[in-house]
């Protein structure tokens, strides 16, 4: 009888860690799927090709990962501010990106220097005091930084 109890106890002692180890990958994958990817783009060039490249990259990431699986912000400042003006050649693409859930913000410091007001800008964009500071904060928050 003692021998049987010892065998049962020994079998349990060996089986328990194996069962627990089998659960670890399930827990890890559940945590991974809850993690949201975060991406911040810098647009500070005056060339529409660069604007379109940033917008293409944002769309491609959403298409690949799923729009709900990634947070994307495009920070526009300096000579790139033309991307967000009412008469921008990229205006329709900016509107499409906003509808797709991409956050697009204009630097108010740049707007002040260029004597632009919010009425000069595309509707539905956001604003930040300083574009460079916004990029820094986003990187500190774990956003991957891209400059097309």
What is each model feature region?
Residues 8, 15-16, 30:
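N-terminal targeting/trafficking signals and adjacent low-complexity tails
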Residues 1-7:
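N-terminal secretory signal peptides that target proteins for export/translocation
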Residues 27-148:
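Secreted/extracellular ectodomain signature
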Residues 8-11, 50:
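Residues in intrinsically disordered, low-complexity segments of regulatory proteins
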Residues 12-25:
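Bacterial N-terminal signal peptides
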């Amino acid at each position: 009888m003692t021998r049987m109890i010892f065998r049962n106890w020994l079998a349990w002692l060996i089986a328990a860690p194996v069962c627990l180890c089998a659960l670890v990958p399930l827990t890890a994958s559940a945590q991974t799927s809850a993690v949201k990817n975060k991406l911040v783009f810098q647009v500070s060039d005056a060339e529409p090709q660069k604007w379109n490249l940033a917008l293409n990259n944002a769309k491609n990431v959403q298409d690949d990962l799923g729009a709900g699986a990634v947070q994307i912000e495009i920070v526009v400042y300096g000579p790139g501010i033309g991307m967000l003006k009412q008469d921008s050649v990229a205006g329709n693409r900016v509107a499409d990106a906003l509808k797709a859930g991409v956050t697009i913000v204009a630097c108010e410091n740049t707007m002040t220097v260029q004597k632009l007001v919010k009425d000069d800008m595309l509707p539905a964009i956001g604003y930040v005091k300083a574009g460079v500071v916004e990029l820094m904060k986003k990187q500190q928050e774990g956003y991957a930084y891209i400059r097309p």
